[in-house]
Each structure stands twice: as C-alpha cells, then as structure tokens.
C-alpha cells in the first residue's frame, strides 16, 4: 500500500496535468461536437466514446483521489486540503450530474437539451480540475 501512495504522490503533478488537459479538450472540443453527430449513429458513437474516454479518465481520477486523500491525511496542510476538496468536488459533479447525462444520451440518443446541460455543468468540473492542477503546481 505504501508503494501505491508513494507512486501517486510522486506522479501527482503529471496526473493532475493530464486531467487538466483532458477536461479542457472535452469542454472545448469533444462535447460541442456532440451537436454535429448524425442522430442515426449517435447512440453507437456515444457508447464508443464513453468506453474509450473511460480508459483514460478512470485511472487518472482514481490516482487523484488516492493521492489527494493520502496527502490530506499524511501532509495535512491547507494546499493538500484545497486539492482534496477540488478532487472530491469533481468526483461529485461527475457522479451526480455528468454520468446521468451520459447515461441518458446512451439510452435515448442525441438530445440537444441534455448535451447543452452537459456542456454547461461541465464548466464546474473544468474549474475544479484546473484548480487541482494549479494547487499541484504550487505544491511542486
């Protein structure tokens, strides 16, 4: 277990940078393109997108959560707690808002109002993961 915590802490800046870049690409490029995908192929395309993006997002999110929780416990300074709150906030928005939107799109197909909600609410995740990266830079 200590090896995992050490690994997460040593690579925190890289992981946080990866999430920072990924969330901005999703916000500015991927989600807006949802509006342009033909309705006849949207469900298939969206399912493929969710499966593939998950290969990148899930490991990064898990590493962030482990690192932020352990740093809050072992280091216990204001920046560690701020980063942990940012990571936790991003997880909450992901689970409570973004994931249900994606489930609806996967089930019902392209719905402009759902895509617009996804884009609008994703700004909060974009802010949170940007904050996490900035804090990580300050800690480095």
Regions found by a protein language model. Name each.
Residues 136-140:
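Juxtamembrane boundary at the C-terminal end of a transmembrane helix
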Residues 57-71, 125-134:
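Core segments of transmembrane alpha-helices
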Residues 100-127:
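Interfacial loop-to-transmembrane junctions
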Residues 20-27, 90-98:
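Alpha-helical transmembrane segments
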